[in-house]
């Protein structure tokens, strides 16, 4: 909140920085004083920082919350078994597994840099066992926006701006089903999935930010076109294709270095 974008037009010059470095190297007692030898800008009261003349540097903001409700299946924290969560550093995929009424359930999550989308996949060991509701909410007082449903395309979109600096944003969630059926409760702004074999949730998000002083805005960017293109292109791929593309991209960097600490136990819990 209260983000003031931009760089100070008059910040440290290369000469000033070099002068400070020399004084630090020489252990000068004047480094932290208002030393006139530095043009009146010692590293004391008159130090000049980049950014605007205030202490508020802004903070990261969330685009919204995605809620998945499995109460229709009777699942609670107390009646599931074999619960396990994992973050696989080698694949860059987070997963959750558990069993309920002799059925094994699995959820996988990753963010794909090549496709510029976040992907969640829900599956079960038996067909027709996925029953839940999904919704997206704008739950951030620093943002203002509106939520729209596109029932035909099974999407939910939030579009708006940051209140303090008018930074525009747009995010879309799309549901892809294998088996089962999906209905839209537009009044409560929620999708209900019934008897599905597998569900893939694709989410894309974007802002009109541009690293270009002094406005830091891309007025030419059409957020609707950018998001729709990402969602449509990703939706044409199977979950396995999206997953494999992500893993290959992740491992192209991750596999450059390996560290062997000897024997280790994979069954030791982190809690």
Model region roles, listed by residue range:
Residues 1-271:
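Aromatic-residue-lined binding/catalytic grooves and analogous aromatic/hydrophobic interfacial grooves
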């Amino acid at each position: 909140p209260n983000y003031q974008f931009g760089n100070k037009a008059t910040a440290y010059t290369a000469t000033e920085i070099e002068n400070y470095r020399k004084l630090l190297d020489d252990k000068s007692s004047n480094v932290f004083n208002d030393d006139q030898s530095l043009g009146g800008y010692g590293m004391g009261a008159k130090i000049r920082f980049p950014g605007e003349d205030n202490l508020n540097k802004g903070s990261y903001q969330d685009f919204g919350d995605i809620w998945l409700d499995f109460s229709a299946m009777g699942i609670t924290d107390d009646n599931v078994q074999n619960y396990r969560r994992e973050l696989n550093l080698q694949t860059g995929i987070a997963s959750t597994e558990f069993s309920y009424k002799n059925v094994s359930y699995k959820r996988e999550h990753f963010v794909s840099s090549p496709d510029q989308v976040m992907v969640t996949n829900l599956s079960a060991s038996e067909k027709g066992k996925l029953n839940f509701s999904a919704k997206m909410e704008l739950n951030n007082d620093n943002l203002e926006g509106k939520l729209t449903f596109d029932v035909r395309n099974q999407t939910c979109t939030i579009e708006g701006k940051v209140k303090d600096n008018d930074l525009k944003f747009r995010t879309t969630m799309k549901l892809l089903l294998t088996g089962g059926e999906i209905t839209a409760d537009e009044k409560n702004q929620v999708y209900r999935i019934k008897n599905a074999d597998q569900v893939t949730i694709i989410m894309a998000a974007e802002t009109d930010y541009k690293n270009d002083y002094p406005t830091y805005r891309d007025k030419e960017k059409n957020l609707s076109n950018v998001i729709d293109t990402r969602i449509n292109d990703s939706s044409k791929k199977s979950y396995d294709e999206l997953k494999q593309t992500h893993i290959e991209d992740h491992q192209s960097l991750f596999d450059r270095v390996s560290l062997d600490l000897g024997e280790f136990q994979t069954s030791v819990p982190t809690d």
